[in-house]
């Protein structure tokens, strides 16, 4: 690769360092760096962010009316070549702190008033980022509903989901993801960094998840 280093942004919804989700995201970041890229691992539980208040159309020409730790997240997502979202499954969806972060990204494809007076959701940047979801849950539970939330979020921030890496386990041990799963996560990070950007989608026309 030539030019500026490509950036992988890992959004971590796990409450615990050393958890399977945390380890998988660390591995994805390692793979991205080994491929010559940069990686930023953002832990949602460490952020101080306010909840979305549904402020409506034309709220601000910037991102959000609030200025908190989300300002850094917006800047990273705008620069990102690839995005990996990781979360355990809590009540069929992502963890609460990650959901706060996701909701606050509504302003990346905000509701705006168009020249003819109608309103529509218009993305602030093109959908060129490749993306993936990593998760961990019991073998007795499903993760597809959490994946659906993540895929919708990725579309909203100019990224396209390409795969899910799921560690479904029967134990209750912290960080039990096996070496084979960690190797797959490293390969995921490498692939995302080495892959070319997606062809830009025409602004204002959101394609399917």
Where do the protein language model's features map onto the residues?
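Beta-strand-loop-alpha "switch" segments that mediate conformational coupling across diverse proteins
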Residues: 162-168
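Glycine-rich beta-alpha junction loops
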Residues: 48, 138, 168-171
């Amino acid at each position: 690769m030539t030019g500026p280093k490509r950036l992988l942004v890992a959004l971590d919804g796990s409450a615990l360092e050393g958890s399977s989700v945390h380890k998988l995201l660390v591995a994805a970041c390692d793979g991205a760096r080994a491929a010559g890229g940069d990686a930023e691992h953002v832990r949602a539980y460490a952020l101080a962010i306010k909840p979305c208040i549904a402020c409506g159309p034309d709220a601000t020409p910037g991102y959000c009316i609030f200025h908190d730790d989300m300002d850094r997240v917006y800047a990273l997502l705008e620069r990102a070549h690839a995005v990996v979202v990781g979360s355990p499954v809590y009540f069929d969806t992502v963890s609460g702190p990650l959901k706060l972060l996701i909701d606050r990204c509504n302003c990346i494809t905000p509701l705006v008033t168009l020249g003819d007076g109608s309103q529509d959701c218009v993305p602030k940047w093109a959908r060129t980022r490749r993306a993936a979801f990593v998760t961990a849950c019991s073998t007795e539970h499903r993760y597809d509903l959490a994946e659906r939330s993540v895929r919708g979020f990725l579309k909203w921030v100019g990224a396209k989901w390409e795969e899910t890496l799921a560690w479904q386990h029967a134990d209750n041990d912290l960080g039990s993801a096996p070496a084979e799963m960690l190797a797959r996560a490293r390969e995921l990070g490498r692939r995302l960094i080495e892959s070319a950007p997606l062809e830009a989608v025409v602004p204002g026309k959101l394609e399917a998840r």
